Design a protein with these regions (language model features):
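A generic structural signal for short hydrophobic patches within well-formed alpha-helices
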Residues: 9-10, 41-44, 117
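Short beta-strand scaffold positions
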Residues: 4, 36, 68, 111-112
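Short, hinge-like loop/turn segments at secondary-structure boundaries
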Residues: 51-55, 84-85, 127-130
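Acidic, PIN/NYN-like endoribonuclease modules and their adjacent C-terminal/linker elements
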Residues: 1, 100, 104-132
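Generic structural signal for small/hydrophobic residues in well-ordered secondary structure
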Residues: 5-6, 44, 77, 103
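Conserved glycosyltransferase catalytic-site signature
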Residues: 6, 38, 95-97
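Active-site neighborhoods of divalent-metal-dependent phosphate/nucleic-acid chemistry enzymes
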Residues: 65-111
Length: 132
């Protein structure tokens, strides 16, 4: 079970060839349970200019399992952000902290192309696809 970060979805939908995109295509072909959350969907859709393309991507992302953060999830995300900062890691996106908190809550690996998660994994036992 995996939650896919915005960075990988954007590369996929823009047709960029990369290792993370190839791995995502492999995960989809293997019918691995793929999770997302509203903020990931929002970030992906925010970068699409065409209304028609935005609707298609929204439909595509709607096929995956949507997990919803609770107040406790948000508090955990804030803890992740603060603890990483204390340990010398600047996390650029609080959304990444929220996605990490969801990964812990739902026992998910994160498939990413974003150094914030690798920084979080230096402080917390975050499971990242391909890093085992």
């Amino acid at each position: 079970m995996v939650i896919v970060d915005t960075s990988v979805w954007i590369d996929l939908f823009k047709g960029r060839e990369s290792g993370p995109v190839a791995k995502l295509e492999q995960l989809l072909a293997e019918e691995v349970d793929v999770f997302t959350t509203g903020l990931i969907v929002q970030e992906v859709l925010s970068g699409i200019k065409s209304g028609k393309e935005r609707e298609q991507v929204r439909t595509d992302l709607g096929h995956f399992i949507l997990v919803m953060p609770t107040l406790d999830t948000h508090a955990h995300a804030a803890e992740i952000f603060g603890t990483c900062r204390k340990k010398g890691y600047t996390i650029r996106s609080i959304v990444d902290c929220l996605v990490a908190a969801l990964a812990f809550e739902y026992d998910l690996e994160i498939h990413e192309n974003d150094r914030d998660y690798r920084h979080i994994a230096q402080v917390f036992p975050l499971r990242i696809v391909g890093s085992a």
